[in-house]
């Protein structure tokens, strides 16, 4: 499994990079689960990582606003993100999801076809009035997306595993692979979840709180990144 770590500033990005994260993900927790950070923060992180890892950037938890989302996605791509990640928050239908993701993918790939688009559903989709992540792989593949992900929409300490069990997450992973997509699992994951994640087999796991000592509002600790990297390689 690859490890995606989500710093919020330059200093944390250096720690995540030196700790051995496979992907350095720029987000802004103050603006939500997949809250967008500023373009200059993405550029700054890109500079300090200096090619050691690809950069991912979130553009927000989006309802049905394809124009706004596609413009935000292009902004993240121009700022230097290699992966552009959008959350499908309060998306009511597969048709809405398809149009949103198609327009985002067009905006990104028209600028640079090598950049990857990540579509995130939410394990707690019933709490946030959105579509099931299990519907996402087929829609994302049709839209030309590269990676599908599941995360928690409401960051209240509850884990993805409290909303989707091992069987459902394995189904999500298998559906992604059947559609030729990479997949990622995130959402208040803990070290004790690693054996289950190994059985599920996602390509990527996304963390913040786990490498902050359990509280995503505190700073990332390099020794915890290193510990997680080591355990992911066992």
From Swiss-Prot:
Pathway: Cofactor biosynthesis; methanofuran biosynthesis. GO terms for molecular function: carbon-carbon lyase activity. Keywords: Lyase, Schiff base. It catalyses: 2 D-glyceraldehyde 3-phosphate = 4-(hydroxymethyl)-2-furancarboxaldehyde phosphate + phosphate + 2 H2O. The keyword Lyase applies. GO terms for biological process: methanofuran biosynthetic process. This is (5-formylfuran-3-yl)methyl phosphate synthase. It comes from Methanosarcina acetivorans (strain ATCC 35395 / DSM 2834 / JCM 12185 / C2A). The gene is mfnB.
């Amino acid at each position: 499994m690859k490890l995606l770590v989500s710093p919020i500033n330059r200093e944390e990005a250096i720690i995540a990079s030196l700790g051995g994260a496979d992907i350095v993900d720029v987000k802004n927790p103050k603006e939500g689960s997949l809250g967008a950070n500023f373009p200059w923060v993405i550029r700054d992180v890109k500079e300090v990582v200096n090619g050691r890892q690809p950069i991912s950037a979130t553009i927000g938890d989006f309802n049905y606003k394809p124009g706004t989302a596609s413009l935000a996605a292009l902004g993240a791509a121009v700022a230097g993100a290699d992966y552009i990640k959008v959350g499908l928050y309060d998306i009511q239908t597969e048709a809405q999801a398809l149009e949103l993701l198609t327009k985002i993918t067009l905006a990104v790939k028209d600028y640079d076809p090598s950049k990857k688009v990540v579509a995130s559903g939410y394990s707690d989709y019933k709490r946030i009035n959105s579509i099931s992540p299990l519907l996402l792989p087929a829609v994302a593949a049709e839209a030309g997306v590269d990676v599908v992900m599941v995360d928690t929409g409401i960051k209240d300490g509850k884990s993805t595993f409290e909303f989707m069990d091992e069987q459902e997450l394995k189904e999500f992973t298998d559906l992604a692979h059947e559609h030729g997509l990479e997949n990622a699992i995130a959402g208040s994951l803990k070290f004790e979840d690693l054996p289950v994640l190994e059985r599920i087999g996602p390509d990527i796991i996304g963390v913040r709180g786990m490498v902050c000592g359990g509280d995503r509002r505190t700073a990332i600790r390099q020794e915890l990144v290193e510990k997680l990297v080591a355990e992911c390689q066992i």
